[in-house]
Amino acid sequence: MEPGRFRNRVKILTFTTSRDPSGQPVESWTGGNPVPAEVKGISGREQLSGGAETAQATIRVWMRFRSELNASSRLEVLSGPYKGQVLNIIGPPVANATGTRLEILCKTGAEK
C-alpha cells in the first residue's frame, strides 16, 4: 500500500426498511463508520433531457476490501473535492489481484 493514497473518507450507505410507531414502513439509507478511500473523477457529461440541462460525473473510488459493500450500496463522500456528495454505485465492486482493495465505479448527478 502506498502511504497517503487513501486520503479521503467515505461512508458506506445501505438501504434499510423499518417501521414507524403506526406500523408504516419507513425506507432510509443508513451508514456506518467512515472508511479511508481514494476518490477521483474520471469523466463528466451534460445533456438536455425534457428541456432541462442535466449533468453527470463518473467517479472511481478505491478502498481496502470491505465485504459489506455491494452494487446496491451508496457512498457518501466526507472529505476531499467531492465532499457532501452521495455516489450511486453503477456496477459490482471489483477486487484487485490480491483481494486487498476494491475498485468501485460510481455516478453522481441526475439519475434517470
From Swiss-Prot:
Pfam families: Phage_H_T_join (PF05521). Functions as a stopper that is part of the head-tail connector and that locks the viral DNA in the capsid. Following tail attachment to the entry receptor, seems to open by a diaphragm-like motion, allowing the genome to exit the capsid through the tail tube to the host cell. During assembly, functions as a docking platform which the preassembled tail tapered by the head-tail joining protein gp17 can bind to. Interacts with the connector protein gp15. Interacts with the head-tail joining protein gp17. Transmembrane segments: none annotated. Belongs to the Caudoviricetes gp7/gp16 head completion protein family. The keyword Nuclease does not apply. The keyword DNA damage does not apply. It comes from the Viruses. It is found in: Virion. InterPro entries: Phage_SPP1_head-tail_adaptor, SSP1_head-tail_sf. It comes from Enterobacteria phage HK97. Its main location: virion. This is Head completion protein gp7. Keywords: Viral genome ejection through host cell envelope, Viral long flexible tail ejection system, Viral penetration into host cytoplasm, Virion, Virus entry into host cell.
